[in-house]
Amino acid sequence: MCADDVPQVFDLERESFNDSSWTIDAFYHEILKNSFAHYFVMEYDQRIIGYIGIWIVIDQAQITTVAIQHDYRGYGLGQLLLKYAMHYTQTKCDTMSLEVRVDNHVAQHVYENLGFQYGGKRKNYYGEGEDAMVMWVKLND
């Protein structure tokens, strides 16, 4: 992902996450100033239809955000992005973790199919009393 991608990624972020979306400045900071951050986009017909963000800190990978444009959901593209992130980080990291809304059962199912397991709950993670489930996977067996 490069700085030119940020406006499209930001639009997709708002479409996907509404009130809890990141600001456009947060995305610019991530790709231009955060040395832990690695971001990738998925394109179709010269449009960004998905993206994923990862922080790599020592031997731990953290999925910071992942989204697929609404019209392209249900085709396995989110799983493809996650597999790419897992492959990208497996030589550098032992484990990968993420947070997901406790009521987002579709995403939880995708993560479980990739080997992620329940790791705990973060109370009020998304604000407004909305909790997050922490999930993690071991990258190297």
Feature locations, PLM:
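Conserved GNAT acetyl-CoA-binding A-motif
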Residues: 89-99, 122
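C-terminal "cap" of GNAT-fold acetyltransferases
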Residues: 39, 101-105, 114, 124-141
